[in-house]
């Protein structure tokens, strides 16, 4: 996924990177005096393109990285489920906080995400599955978000290595089986629990909170003015999500620098390993990883030139804006099918 607001920088021979500015500006080809004073030589040091981390492309790539890691984590276990936890009217009362209605100026009550509810749920799940079901290794990836229409707080949780003895099929929605579990519902205890089988699609939907979460210098102010806590994610650590798959398949992954993912409608798609895998592999095989990086750079440069020269006659900044707008419109057109 391309960045729509890339930065330009220089990497010195000692590995230090200095960021110059936005690649969309036309003055990016020369290093300013501020960089020269830091010892950057624009003729001998390596010029690099750095993703901004904030645009639609970067956020979507970040969410896909997490979806990939969750998908690969799930491949290491026999039973994995996707849970949606919602609040009933009685239990949503403890989430209400005062806020000012911007249209009327009145003080109103709004429901805000409460991370501790999710943390307590996971603690109870792990304790019960260890004590009752002899399973001490339940792992998870979860997010807290607000509903798109009613802004009601809720949670999505992927549970890995999680056999549910009393799983009951209650519906079939858009081709997806929907289950419930009396045991899991009692452990949540604050509203409804719906359960689906986990897939790359459910992982992608869970990680999609990054597309909605505000970022940047105004983010804290926006949440403060709204009177609510931001969307968030929590996950198992030590080891991280996907680590087991990396350990079992790292030689195969980096021999071809790619991982094949099954498509929902059949076939497969090969993508680069998640950055988390890159970090692990770089620590173990620094020389091999350096070779891989050089190959990636050559491919990226060819793709970059084709993107700006072979596909458009628009000025760089206009083309980036158009690309991002098209991607935003595509995302808005998507409808939840789970």
Predicted regions and their residues:
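C-terminal non-catalytic accessory extensions
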Residues: 191-194, 295-338
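Signature for HUH/AEP ssDNA processing cores
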Residues: 61-149
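Intrinsic-disorder/low-complexity loop/linker signature
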Residues: 8, 14-16, 26, 44-45, ...
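Non-catalytic peripheral regions of nucleotide-handling enzymes
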Residues: 53, 111, 305-307
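DNA replication initiation on ssDNA origins
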Residues: 1-71
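Short beta-strand element of the conserved SAM-dependent methyltransferase core
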Residues: 85, 157-161, 319
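Residue-level detector of short, conserved catalytic/binding motifs and their immediate flanks
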Residues: 53, 81, 153
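Conserved His + Asp/Glu catalytic blocks
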Residues: 107-108, 147-153, 159-297
């Amino acid at each position: 996924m391309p960045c729509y607001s890339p930065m330009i920088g220089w990497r010195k021979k000692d590995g230090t990177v200095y960021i110059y500015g936005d690649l969309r500006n036309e003055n990016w080809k020369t290093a300013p005096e501020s960089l020269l004073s830091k010892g950057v030589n624009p003729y001998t040091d390596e010029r690099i393109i750095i993703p901004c981390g904030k645009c639609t492309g970067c956020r979507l790539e970040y969410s896909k990285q997490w979806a990939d890691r969750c998908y690969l984590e799930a491949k290491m276990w026999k039973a994995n489920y996707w849970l949606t936890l919602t609040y009933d009217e009685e239990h949503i009362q403890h989430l209400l906080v005062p806020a000012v209605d911007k249209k009327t100026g009145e003080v109103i009550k709004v429901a805000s995400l409460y991370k501790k509810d999710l943390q307590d749920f996971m603690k109870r799940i792990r304790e019960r599955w260890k004590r009752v079901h002899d399973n001490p290794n339940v792992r998870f990836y979860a997010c807290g978000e607000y509903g798109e229409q009613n802004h009601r707080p809720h949670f999505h949780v992927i549970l890995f290595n999680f056999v549910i003895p009393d799983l009951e099929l209650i519906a079939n929605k858009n081709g997806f089986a929907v289950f419930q579990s009396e045991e899991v519902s009692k452990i949540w205890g604050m509203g409804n629990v719906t359960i689906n089988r986990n897939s790359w699609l459910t992982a992608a939907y869970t990680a999609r909170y990054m597309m909605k979460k505000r970022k940047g210098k105004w983010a804290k102010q926006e949440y403060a003015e709204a009177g609510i806590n931001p969307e968030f994610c929590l996950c198992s650590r030590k080891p991280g999500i996907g680590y087991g798959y990396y350990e079992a398949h790292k030689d195969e992954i980096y021999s071809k620098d790619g991982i094949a993912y099954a498509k929902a409608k059949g076939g497969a798609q090969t993508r680069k390993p998640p950055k988390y895998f890159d970090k692990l592999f770089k620590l173990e095989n620094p020389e091999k990883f350096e070779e891989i990086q050089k190959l990636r750079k050559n491919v990226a440069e060819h793709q970059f030139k084709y993107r700006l020269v072979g596909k458009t006659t628009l000025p760089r900044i206009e083309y980036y804006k158009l690309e991002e707008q098209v991607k935003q419109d595509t995302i808005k057109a998507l409808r939840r099918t789970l």
